Amino acid sequence: MVRFISFTSPIAALLLLSFGVKHASTASTNTCIVANSDSDDAITIAEAFEKCKTGGTVVFPKDSSYQLNSIVTTSDLKNVNINFAGTIHLPAREESYRNGDYYIQIKGTHIKMYGGGTINGHGQAWYDALDHTAPSVLRIAANDSIIGGFTIINSPRAHLNVTNSTNLVLHDFTLHTVSNNSYLPKNTDALDLYHSSGITFRDSMLTIGDDCVAIKEDVEKVIVSNVTCRGGHGYSIGSLGIGGRKDYVKHVNFRNSTCIDCENGVRVKTWAGGKGIVEDINYNDIILQNVDNPILVTTHYCDPNVIEYCNGNDDNSLNISSIHFKDITGTASALGNPIVNVNCSIESPCSDITFSGIDITKASNTTDNVCVYLEGSDEVSECSS
């Protein structure tokens, strides 16, 4: 079911020689072309990865199409190229997938994934059912890897879920999820990050229904650059500290990115009662066009179903410090919310939050900026406008 090419054959050896010594020395040992299954292409995809998981190349040919009827889990990949030029269709909505972690997992070290292919999440059935419990489309747990250059459409939930990864570059993604009716796609974050370090996300176009980027628990050393997001919930730190959990996020740089018609622009959100730290977060050269909440820092994040817990723990949250907003420009929406809204906790006030080059045009009904429990707010000009 998997076409398996050995590079020990005489023909393959001649091909390698034709590419020169440099290419031959770095070429993968085997190539596995993913075939179709009679019942579930998840089976043949798994076979291809198993046969080429060490030093191989897995190929989804251009114009090929694959229908998944179960999840795909790959692990222990080492020095693997994934030439993803085809189309993968995720399964139809079924109860068995509710609250699952992912549909496809890529896990290993030194992975290169490219090719211009498409994953179609067929999320409309989930939106129509008001069911926000679908798995993420693609989970990545990869070290020293480069993944990108392909498209995810109609995601039933988060598009990219990155966890337990180090030194990972994500680039040139097109993520496009919209509903064809009034039932909107919920929880369809473009990128969620967990338990990772040294992550770059760049050069991507996003049209989604939730966070453009959500940097969640225990993440550090992140760069987000040259990303355009439409209709999302902004470039977010968090949410963090749910249920009193101890989390951290530090050393994050968002730069040269745009948010258009977004609910939030740049945002830090932590739960009431949470523990831990958020520090050294930098937003530079961000354009916000028609955004409801341009700059938002809150330690009072909560879900309606646990509002009693949040109200009882509202006096403290994570320690938020060294958050810098520089050259944030654009326009606020007609919703009338403040340009700057910093709302921290009495027992864990925010500190060292700075603003420079903030040039966001107000709507006629925009209310005054808010700075609550921000140390040194008397000396912050944005807190008096």
UniProtKB/Swiss-Prot annotation:
PbH1 repeats lie at residues 165-195, 196-217, 219-241, 249-270, 350-376. GO terms for biological process: cell wall organization; pectin catabolic process. Optimum temperature is 30 degrees Celsius. Keywords: Cell wall biogenesis/degradation, Disulfide bond, Glycoprotein, Glycosidase, Hydrolase, Repeat, Secreted, Signal. One of its GO terms (molecular function) is rhamnogalacturonan alpha-L-rhamnopyranosyl-(1->4)-alpha-D-galactopyranosyluronide lyase activity. The keyword Repeat applies. GO terms for cellular component: extracellular region. It is found in: Secreted. Residues 1-26 form the signal peptide. Optimum pH is 4.0. Glycans are attached at N143, N161, N164, N180, N226, N256, N319, N343, N365. Disulfide bonds join C212-C229, C344-C350. Belongs to the glycosyl hydrolase 28 family. This is Exopolygalacturonase rpg15. It comes from Rhizopus delemar (strain RA 99-880 / ATCC MYA-4621 / FGSC 9543 / NRRL 43880). The lineage of its organism: Eukaryota, Fungi, Fungi incertae sedis, Mucoromycota, Mucoromycotina.
